[in-house]
Amino acid sequence: MTFLITAGPTREPIDPVRYISNRSSGKMGYAIAEAALDAGHDVILISGPVNLAPPHKAKFISVSTSDEMFDAVHQHADSSDVCVLCAAVADYKPAQVSPVKIKKCAAQVSLELIRTRDILESLGQRQNRQFLLVGFAAETDHLEANATRKLREKNCDMIVANDARIGMETDENELLIVFRNGETKKISRAPKTFLAHELVKIFLNSQQKSLTKKM
């Protein structure tokens, strides 16, 4: 099988030296890529800017902005069996990007933001998709409720949710998986490398069940 995996943050430029981003380290996405490779599968890893070396057996695509990640994902989704959208893609970007560095000249500066294109939602809207679609959700409260709502709104097959205060910029995480049929599965706090191997098993099992239903 072929796994398409996104990882890391995106950077939305304000001017040539400043940007909007987030604290995602990319460790979870990279660990999933390694686990899928260990299981003998092909991997397409689409990554925002991180301080990690890509798995040498993966097809690696480096991006910076949400638009670049959107385009790369759509280019490769249909050739994939499992799409794992683990990246922390910016929800908003500056409406205008200054071609020169913005100078400090006032006590307050307003920055107009507009929505970025929603990668998970755009894949969920595809008719007759053949790939398993997995989204991720980092939350600070109401973990299961927010994950369930995201699953329904984005029309994906499962959501892997975590408390952002536990998993951000660390080597460990604690996960709650919400499935399309309403079932949930909790994986207790553990190293991300261990969690990644458990997730790959779950993804493969879900994809096999999906294929069986379609036959």
Where are these regions (language model features)?
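A cross-family phosphate/adenosyl-ligand binding-site feature
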Residues: 1-215
